[in-house]
């Protein structure tokens, strides 16, 4: 949708800015209409953790403590008032955005040829999707499939914002029925993206929400090895997110056969160490506890022992190093970790 069709509909630029400002994107849409582009700042190498690639981030100002600033880690564009008269409109709640404005955003998304503009629109839609009423409206407008179409966008930042928007939409159970068909594409993004990238993190967040209930967990049964491999090559933030998915899956007894026979890197067991970050170690112990609660028959156990490098042999077999490592963790300074270890060993 170009300038000529938007401006007459809403009268003037102030009105248009007011429409989407509550969704945290007035400045971004102003740039979209005016043909401008938003700036990106590259983080300096000095501020990056070792082994983490430099990432480009949208130059925005967050509203500290706001709801949207906490939802799925999405950045929120701070509205910039055009004048005093429009200030009240600009600070509307994203939950009060009108249906026709959501339609307009989806239409703009489909017609935009500019990657920064697509990012800004997806960011706005993602912020709107933090509210149930908008989650339902976007689904009814077939917006889920419109948004998901950008999972294959050639620009990485567009794919990240697409995943973030789908993640918020996924908090709605009805929306999950529409989003589940994109699981293979999301898994491919994880596998093909650079290690420790924003793309991997955003994709894992989406899979976490999708795997909270048992209904769609079977869609991930072929991805166990991929998830286990991520544990040994990624930074803490991605390890935590990966373990959230694994804990969800291992909480379902129907998934256990697929989990224990999946090929697993032997180095997974090395993470059960006092030097591992507590946030990672606690979830590892929860995952291990779920595995320990599984009781295979003698015949099944014998069959699994013949599967070289499967998770059963790495973590559950008598030959595994896990038991000795758990004993060492009984002296961990974190009391919660001690309790988790004691529960597994008893």
Protein language model regions, located:
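N-terminal "cap/leader" segments of large eukaryotic alpha-helical scaffolds
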Residues: 2-130
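Conserved functional loop/turn residues at catalytic and ligand-binding sites
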Residues: 33-36, 142, 155, 263
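Alpha-helical solenoid repeats of the armadillo/HEAT superfamily
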Residues: 73-79, 113-126, 155-168, 178-181, ...
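Onset and early core of a folded interaction/catalytic domain in large eukaryotic regulators
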Residues: 94-186, 234
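Core helices of alpha-solenoid repeat scaffolds
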Residues: 98-103, 139-145, 176-187, 217-225, ...
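Alpha-solenoid HEAT/Armadillo-like helical repeat scaffolds in large eukaryotic proteins
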Residues: 104-111, 149-150, 185-193, 226-230, ...
């Amino acid at each position: 949708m170009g300038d000529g069709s938007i401006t007459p509909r809403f009268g003037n630029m102030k009105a248009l800015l007011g429409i989407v400002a509550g969704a945290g994107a007035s400045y971004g849409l102003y740039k979209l209409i005016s043909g401008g582009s938003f700036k990106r700042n590259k983080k300096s190498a000095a501020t990056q953790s070792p082994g983490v690639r430099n990432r480009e981030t949208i130059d925005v100002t967050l509203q500290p403590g706001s709801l949207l600033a906490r939802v799925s880690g999405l950045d929120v564009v701070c509205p910039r008032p055009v004048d005093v008269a429009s200030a009240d409109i600009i600070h509307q709640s994203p939950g009060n955005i009108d249906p026709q404005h959501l339609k307009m955003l989806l239409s703009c998304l489909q017609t935009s040829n500019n990657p920064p503009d697509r990012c800004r629109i997806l960011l706005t839609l993602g912020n709107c999707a933090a509210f149930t009423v908008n989650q339902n409206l976007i689904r009814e407008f077939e917006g889920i499939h419109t948004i998901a179409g950008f999972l294959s966008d050639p620009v990485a930042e567009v794919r990240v914002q697409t995943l973030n928007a789908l993640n918020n939409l996924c908090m709605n159970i009805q929306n999950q029925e529409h989003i589940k068909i994109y699981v293979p594409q999301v898994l491919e993004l994880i596998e093909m993206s650079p290690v420790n990238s924003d793309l991997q993190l955003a994709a894992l967040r989406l899979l976490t929400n999708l795997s909270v209930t048992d209904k769609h967990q079977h869609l991930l049964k072929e991805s166990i090895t991929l998830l286990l491999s991520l544990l040994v090559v990624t930074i803490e933030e991605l390890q935590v997110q990966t373990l959230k998915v694994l804990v969800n899956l291992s909480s379902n007894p129907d998934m256990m056969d697929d989990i224990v026979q999946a090929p697993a890197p032997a180095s997974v067991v090395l993470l059960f160490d006092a030097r591992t970050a507590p946030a990672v170690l606690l979830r590892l112990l929860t995952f291990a506890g779920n595995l320990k609660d599984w009781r295979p028959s003698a015949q099944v156990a014998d069959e699994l022992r013949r599967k070289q490098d499967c998770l059963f042999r790495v973590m559950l077999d008598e030959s595994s190093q896990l038991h000795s490592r758990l004993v060492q963790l009984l002296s961990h300074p974190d009391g919660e970790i001690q309790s988790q270890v004691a529960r597994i060993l008893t």
